[in-house]
Structure formats: structure tokens, C-alpha cells
Amino acid sequence: MKVGLLKDIKDGEFRTIMTPNEAAELVSLGAEVYVETGAGEGASFEDADYVKAGAKIAKDMKEIYATCDFVTKVKELEECEFDLLREGQIIFTCLHPAASKDEVDVLLKSKVIAFTAEDTHRYGSPNCEIAGKLGLLKGAEHLLRTNGGSGQLICGAGGAPAANILIIGAGLAGTGALQLAY
């Protein structure tokens, strides 16, 4: 099977859905892995890291879609990708189908096999833990006086009291926030 990793093009998206270690694992299982140039840069992975893992670097998304049986990335498809889909191709990404009727219509019309990555985590969602920790950090950022906050630190300092925080929920996100807070 030919597996393709796309570079996410959505503004503000820096994650990658496949690390070089995961690419190496797929290669060891007999897959040919293609990585769009720059696909891992936002997550601090260079093209050379993927090449070292046994992947081939593709020049653009068109090459990935034309070459690969299985195509993956983090965020939902962009309109510029719709015409690149091929019948029978497997798409694995965070589709959020309830949010985009147009995207669902394109997926159905193109006859791809689409999986929503947001619903298929093996051990719950590691992204939820990350979201909880980042949420706490964002809250701490808003406490800074330069950002209009009270100037308190979550942990307190120099005899000043710590800020009071409220974490709603005790799932993976809430637990992640709690781990960072204490």
C-alpha cells in the first residue's frame, strides 16, 4: 500500500498526523510512505527525518493524491483538494462531517473511503490531554497584566497567592489541565 502524508494548509495548523517514527513503522510493515515536502515542519520534523525513516518526499499534494492509496493529514479537506480525490482512495483526517455538507457531498460523489480521525483514537484521545494542558497555559497567558489580566501566576510567587482556577470536567482534557496546574 502507498501511504501519503499531506502538509496541512489550514491557517494556524502546525501538527502532523504522522511522525517519522510512525512512518518507519509503516515502512517496516511493507508500506511505501510518501511525505509531502514540509509536512512535518510545523511539528519540528524535517523532510530528512522522514527520508531517514524510509519515506519518499513528494513535491506537492497533487503528487500525493495521484500516487497514494491512503492519504492522511490532521485537518479537514480544503476545497482545493476536492478534485484530487480518486475512487477507492482511503482518506484519514479530521473531517468533522457535521460541519460541512459540501465536504460530505464531495466525499460521497468521489467514492472514497473516508475515516474521521477525530473519532478513531486507540486509547481515548491524546489530543484531549494536549488540549487540556494548552487550555491551562492559555488561561495563564490571559492572567498576565500585559494581556489585560490581574498579573497573578497560577503557581503564585514571592509570597503572592496563586490564582484560583476552575477546571470543568475530569476527562482527558480536564485531567491534562490538572496535571499541569499541580
Regions found by a protein language model. Give the residues of each.
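An N-terminal-biased, well-structured beta-alpha scaffold segment characteristic
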Residues: K2-V106, S110
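Glycine/serine-rich phosphate-binding loop and adjoining beta1-alpha1 elements at the start
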Residues: K2, D8, E79-N164
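Gly/Ala-rich phosphate-binding loop of Rossmann-like dinucleotide-binding domains
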Residues: V27, L178, Y182
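Hydrophobic/small residue at the entry helix of a nucleotide-binding pocket
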Residues: A173
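Residue-level recognition of conserved structural "scaffold" positions that shape functional pockets
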Residues: D11, G176-L178
